[in-house]
């Protein structure tokens, strides 16, 4: 059975690209922002891993990570943050909030797959 990945990104082209890259190996669901992602989780959808953008409207990646990692029901789910922001202090904040990895956009598809597979092995 394929592992489930939830992708959060407000940019349709990035959601579509990431979904295309991952759908060969994983069952992929997507949402446009953190609020939609939380709604999916609260409705019973339980992914094996979450890939989220940092900058999104309504509920951004930082707040999404904080809510997921502070929730007993979802805190075990590994989270990879994707962002075009390359600031060490932002990466440190996200890791301190519980993000498991951080990858800059544009990303190398093979690197994203390798990071996902590595985190899923650790689970």
Description of each model-found segment:
Residues 12-29:
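Two-component/phosphorelay signaling modules centered on CheY-like receiver
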Residues 107-117:
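C-terminal output helix
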Residues 85-86:
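Short, conserved "switch-loop" micro-motifs in signal-transduction and mechanochemical regulators
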Residues 30-49:
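Acidic, metal-coordinating helix/loop segments flanking the phosphotransfer/catalytic sites
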Residues 56:
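Receiver (REC) domain active-site loop signature in two-component systems and cognate sites
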């Amino acid at each position: 059975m394929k592992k489930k990945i939830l992708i959060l990104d407000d940019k349709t082209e990035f959601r579509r690209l990431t979904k295309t890259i991952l759908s060969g190996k994983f069952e992929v669901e997507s949402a446009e922002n953190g609020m939609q992602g939380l709604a999916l989780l609260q409705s019973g959808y339980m992914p094996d891993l979450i890939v989220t953008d940092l900058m999104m409207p309504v509920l951004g990646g930082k707040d999404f990570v904080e809510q997921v990692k502070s929730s007993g029901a979802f805190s075990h789910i590994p989270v990879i943050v994707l962002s075009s922001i390359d600031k060490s202090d932002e990466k440190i904040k996200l890791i301190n909030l519980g993000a498991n990895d951080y990858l800059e956009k544009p990303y190398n598809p093979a690197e994203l797959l390798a990071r996902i597979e590595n985190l899923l092995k650790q689970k």
